[in-house]
Amino acid sequence: MEFPEHSRHLLQCLSEQRHQGFLCDCTVLVGDAHFRAHRAVLASCSMYFHLFYKDQLDKRDIVHLNSDIVTAPAFALLLEFMYEGILQFKGLPIEDVLAAASYLHMYDIVKVCKKKLKEKATTDSTKKEEDTSSFSDKVECLSDGSSHMAGDLPSDEDDVEDEKINILPGKTDLATESRNMWIRLPTESASIPRTVGEAETHTTAAGKTAVSPCSSTGSLSHRSAISMGDSADVDCVLDLSVKSSLSGTETMNNSYLSSQEILRNSLVQVKVEKEATCDKNDIDTTEYDIERNTVKESVSSNIRASYEPVHLAPIREDSVLRELDHDDKASDDDMITLENERVQMEANTDNSLLPYVPNIISPTGQIFMCPLCNKVFPSPHILQIHLSTHFREQEGIRSKPANDVHVPTCSLCGKTFSCMYTLKRHERTHSGEKPYTCTQCGKSFQYSHNLSRHAVVHTREKPHACKWCERRFTQSGDLYRHIRKFHCELVNSLSVKSETLGLPAVRDWTLEDSSQELWK
């Protein structure tokens, strides 16, 4: 007579005994963490423990695991799986579980983790494509509306009437794109008299979304009567060729320039210079122009005015795809000036950071704005250093546990960890602390597993034996490499035989998956 629930009842009893410490005959050390368990269960679920306990069983009360590969939370999760048959990640990074399972040769768990990582990567790529496509549709819709808005604005009397700027979408070569974008905010500029037409335009735009002063669809301005020094143009040039221009609304909201009092006597002008071959003597310092082949600023102004959070990568990609065709035959005379528009801000704009603005503006009245986070800096050199932090943050960020507000973070390098134990172990790399000392020779080590590995030098012990040829090794890694090199075909034949006999999958000790994970 068969009892279907017998195996489940047996696992439940073993799990209760482990929690009570009853009949536990071994201790697994992962760094400073101790785990009591039963040898039979460990050897049945892990090829690593099976080889460890096969020889000299009575001398294997304590097992040291490599804490650089196996973390304490990951081993606790795998230990629960051994006793309960249920795998629950509990917010732990899948990469940590995968590394621990590969180290312990638990290949069923390795396959599950690889599958989850593959599904996660597929989901992220699909979501990114959907976001990009929806963003492109939104940009096309807003660009049509912005082109009509630009037609209603008055044009400058000195420029040609009814002049149109054709915006052609398409990919352009990044090497020929506009370079040296800079932003200037003079704090002491004479107020320019407003004409009747400008006053009407200002009144009409008060109830609508503010049009960006750096938008290519904005109306043309009068020539500025204020002259700037020639040296100022050289100092404020910064290479930001890949970044898209910022809208006026986004600039004012996110860089602490949200007060109408400051904007009343401020002139926001953006200049996108052409190729580096332009003669500096031909640049008129009394005029701050913008070239006709600039990007669609009206699109970015409409999108950012709606305060919708948009990921940086789609904005960059869309701005590059929608830049105008570069006209190599265009001369410097084709440049047009911007209008000195008064930007209307929302009544609920946050003014808490406003007092910091005068302190960061240089004595010459220039500030330099980051196109990624809209922070302002007094010099282009400081801005360049700040920009490098954005690109460092995009690489090497370890995934954080889900629903974990207090993530252990290193105060020196900012690296995050899954638990406080791994953080403390990481801090030794900065302090150089070596708390583990050999009693035989007095040599110190940073990690306990290094001390255990060193102890074999004095004992000349070779605890790891090959079950096929009885050859012995000092380290488990040497044994593993030996099995791969000399007995790989034998292991594969045994795994095929196990499948034919219908043996439990947990004892199927193939080396295909773990060999790629640990020993590349």
Curated annotation (Swiss-Prot):
Residues 24-91 form the BTB domain. Its main location: nucleus. Residues 121-140 are annotated as: Disordered. A zinc finger (C2H2-type) spans 368-390, 408-430, 436-458, 464-487. Keywords: DNA-binding, Metal-binding, Nucleus, Repeat, Repressor, Transcription, Transcription regulation, Zinc, Zinc-finger. GO terms for biological process: regulation of transcription by RNA polymerase II. It holds the Pfam family BTB. Coiled coil: none annotated. Disulfide bonds: none annotated. InterPro entries: BTB/POZ_dom, SKP1/BTB/POZ_sf, Znf_C2H2_sf, Znf_C2H2_type. One of its GO terms (molecular function) is DNA binding. It is found in: Nucleus. GO terms for cellular component: nucleus. Transcriptional repressor that plays a role in various developmental processes. Specifically binds the consensus DNA sequence 5'-[AC]ACATCTG[GT][AC]-3' which contains the E box core, and acts by recruiting chromatin remodeling multiprotein complexes. Belongs to the krueppel C2H2-type zinc-finger protein family. ZBTB18 subfamily. This is Zinc finger and BTB domain-containing protein 18. It comes from Xenopus laevis (African clawed frog). The gene is zbtb18.
